[in-house]
Amino acid sequence: MEQVRTYTAKRKSSYIKNSYENKGLYVLSVIFLVVYYIVPQYFGLSVAGFDLTAQRLMMLIMFFYIISFNDIKNRFFDIIRHSIYLPYIIVFMCVTMYTMVLRVDINTFMQSAIEFICMYILVYIIKDVLGIKRTLQIIKVLLFIMCLQGIVEYVIQFSLFQYLETLPGKINIQIRSGSYRIMGPCNHALAYGLVLISSFPLICVDLEKKALNLLQNKILFMLVMLNIFLTGSRSALAIFIIEVLFIIILSDRENKKKTIIFLFCFLLISVIAVLGFYNTSFSQTVLRQFASIFDELFGTQWAVKFGAEVERLSQSSSYRELLPKIFKQSWLNPLIGRGVSRHFSAVIDGYTIMSIDNFFVAQYIRYAYPGLIAYVLLLINTLVKMLKNVKINKGLVLACLFGFFSYYMNLWFMDALQTLKYVYMLMAIFEVILIENNKTADTKQIKKSKYIK
């Protein structure tokens, strides 16, 4: 009896210790996810010229916590070793490393290194701590808060997140055609558009049925749509419409019918409201957004009727058309990029190019062809893997696929603007889906082998 009591006491102590470790890890994981998703990049400290943002600080805390416990550390590095992204990330990081050395620019390496470390911390958190269901619940709550703030921001023409600004000079307030463009926790209205279109498909996932349903979160769907309008981003609105259409097409018959009826009623009420308040700033903004997209597609000038600065929009389109010509500039080294800290300017066809509103062109400038090719291969690999594994969890994988593809499609019209972490979050979720599927397959194989034996 004495031996049994001693053994029980030891088991109990071990359990309590693990419980405290797990509780601490859980709390840190939730804080990390909140900071990662919603806390702006301009909140932090400047240490010896390096911006220690809240996200980077939480990354350090999480990383040191993980490596402090052998079992947690082993699981974390095991995730990295078996990652589907690792070979491509290694090649890309090698390019950033030699560019850092040759251009004497440590940010060239550190910027990408931090982003990928955060992605793998997310993979670990989702897989071993929060789980996919709880992670999606937290993301939906954060997106809801973000969208409510967006409405308040439009009314007061000031982002509440700006009260957190401790790293000055990073916010770019935008006014287009007399209308304020909301930017949420981002530093630019276009960046906020990227966040919304990459996150939107996640709110349409029905985890129970493993399917997509546009009406899974009706209120949040309408809030996201409203916020996209208020960003003033034509490309984000156009891509959002495409996302909505694909989600409807890929919904099951019952949800498709309900969605079409709901959207018909919603659009009818919206049209009546917009026309009823035709002369208000909001109605003009909505009409201008649609007219701008129509003008871009068909070469018309309907947007001018709703206060658009047509000349400015035309110059913006012409400017973007010139950007791919940067690939032909002989003075740029095709093997060694300029790094991330150097200012770029060039004169092409008489235009002075200073702002690179194309992520892929910007990647070429930063990392030359080796870096651009390595990064594009990472994207292609991810896209192919997602397409091949849709059947694992149709709703969630398609949501990751739509968010991933929409995000990078939009980057043909702008740079990433410090929003890559949102698409890396989708990649982290997809990685966990594959890990869980492989684990299930291995379990079934073991059971099958035992049965045969």
Residue ranges and their predicted role:
Residues 2-72, 94-99, 407-409, 425:
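N-terminal signal-anchor transmembrane segment
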Residues 12-15, 19, 58-73, 199-208, ...:
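Hydrophobic, aromatic-rich transmembrane alpha-helices
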Residues 38-39, 43-45, 176, 300-367:
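Long extracytoplasmic/lumenal interhelical loops at the membrane interface
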Residues 61, 199, 245, 396-410, ...:
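Transmembrane alpha-helices of multi-pass inner-membrane enzymes
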Residues 84-93, 103-127, 138, 143:
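Aromatic-anchored transmembrane helix interface
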Residues 136-164, 184-250:
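Alpha-helical transmembrane segments of multi-pass inner-membrane proteins
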Residues 148, 154-157, 251-308, 329-332:
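A membrane-periplasm/extracellular boundary helix in multi-pass inner-membrane enzymes
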Residues 207, 211-212, 216, 244-258, ...:
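Hydrophobic transmembrane alpha-helices and their immediate junctions
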